[in-house]
Amino acid sequence: AVFDQSCKGVYDRSLFSKLDRVCDDCYNLYRKHYVATGCRRNCYGNLVFRQCLDDLMLVDVVDEYYVASVQMV
């Protein structure tokens, strides 16, 4: 994964990898380029990312991922 320059704040490699993995897995699920780019938009603070969490059945950790994405902004 390549670091997204739009993400501000403290760069935490493990946190970034965790968020990026959600988008990679979501892309692998749908195989649509716009899913991968949309998921990462606004430093993961978007509805596509939230939908990916739901689609990947990660709803039990949504709050954890949301807090992580806010830390990246």
UniProtKB/Swiss-Prot annotation:
Gene Ontology MF terms in the entry: neuropeptide hormone activity
Source species, domain of life = Eukaryota
Which cysteine-cysteine pairs are annotated as disulfide bonds in the entry?
Answer: C7-C43, C23-C39, C26-C52
User: Does the record bear Transmembrane in its keywords?
Assistant: no
Q: Which UniProt keywords apply?
A: Amidation, Carbohydrate metabolism, Disulfide bond, Glucose metabolism, Hormone, Neuropeptide, Secreted
Its biological purpose: Hormone found in the sinus gland of isopods and decapods which controls the blood sugar level. Has a secretagogue action over the amylase released from the midgut gland. May act as a stress hormone and may be involved in the control of molting and reproduction.
Task: Family membership, please give it.
Answer: Belongs to the arthropod CHH/MIH/GIH/VIH hormone family.
Entry protein name:
Crustacean hyperglycemic hormone
